[in-house]
Amino acid sequence: LLFAVSFSYSQRWNTPAENKIDNPVIKSIIDEATNNSQLENLAHELFDVVGPRLVGTPQMQQAHDWAVAKYNSWGIDAYNHEYGKWRGWERGITHIDMVEPRLRTLVGRQLAWSPSTKKKGVTAEVTLVPDIESKEDFENWLKTINGKFVLVSQYQPTGRSDSNWEEFALPESFEKMKNDREEMSRKWFSNLRLTGYGYRDINKAFEDAGAVGLISSYWSRVSGANKVFSARTDKIPNIDVNLEDYGALYRLAKNGKKPVVKVVATSTEHGVVPTFNTIAQIKGVEKPDEYVILSAHFDS
């Protein structure tokens, strides 16, 4: 599939002279990609039907079984090879509403392996880490977060990619935005260091201080796309919220407007489950003792 995509783009953009290829194998690959590509159908089945494929989830197992069945339908031997165990977990419903200072439904989802809220959810004020001068300042502030949601990510001044700014903004506007963003990032990491924690362990401090949940937003610097990794909490939910919604919560909290959100986040623990690699094999004829290995991440 990877070769098919690559050659298909080559066929589309190169001139006829540049595409003159005599090798029959390469010509066959180009013809297959150009005239018989199944990439869109396969992507639909895997992305739209199966969906996200976190290791240890039923969806990951569904994807493995789908791949084996698909290979078999092509006459290719395939099987799932168990290589270990993993934490079994499944994301359920995530619903987030801002209820103060106005009503607005927010776009977000649970981080991987996030604990659940109670069935009816939790409603609480949203706060953020203030600018501090010492670890003592931070420890004193921790005493104020009991029963609240905490914003744990850096605020982003824009949701547009740099390439979009470069194309549409004035050069001086683009340069100012980059400088402002770099300064915000410098101050954020400096403030984090003053807490005495790192980004891997600070969430535990929030949880131990009585926060009811954490709200994060890890922007990928591509319009509309966040990176969603794993929660680092044991008992409280960690919710990822889209950049624009996170920015609104941040500005409200920063300006003393005390936003309130209601979060319903359900998930299911499935205990320890087996994990697999899906392996398919097309046996060679000319050199049966040699291997060409094509591999890729199947989890997502």
Language model features with spans:
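Structural recognition of the beta-strand scaffold that forms the well-ordered cores
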Residues: L42-E45, Y79-N80, V126-L128, F149-S153, ...
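Soluble metallo-hydrolase cores and metallopeptidase-like ectodomains found primarily
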Residues: P24-V25, P115-E139, V228-S300
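Extracytoplasmic/secreted proteins, especially bacterial periplasmic and envelope-associated proteins
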Residues: I21-S28, Q38-N41, E45, Q62, ...
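Bacterial Sec-dependent N-terminal signal peptides
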Residues: L1-A17
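Solvent-exposed, acidic/flexible segments
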Residues: N19-D22, E32-E40, R53-H64, L192-Y199, ...
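Noncatalytic luminal/extracellular "stalk/propeptide" segments of secretory-pathway proteins
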Residues: R12-P16, D22, N35, H44, ...
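Loop-rich non-cytosolic ectodomains and luminal regions
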Residues: V150, R186, L194, G198-Y199, ...
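Solvent-exposed loop/turn segments at secondary-structure junctions
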Residues: P52-R53, G84-G88, E133-S134, Q156-G159, ...
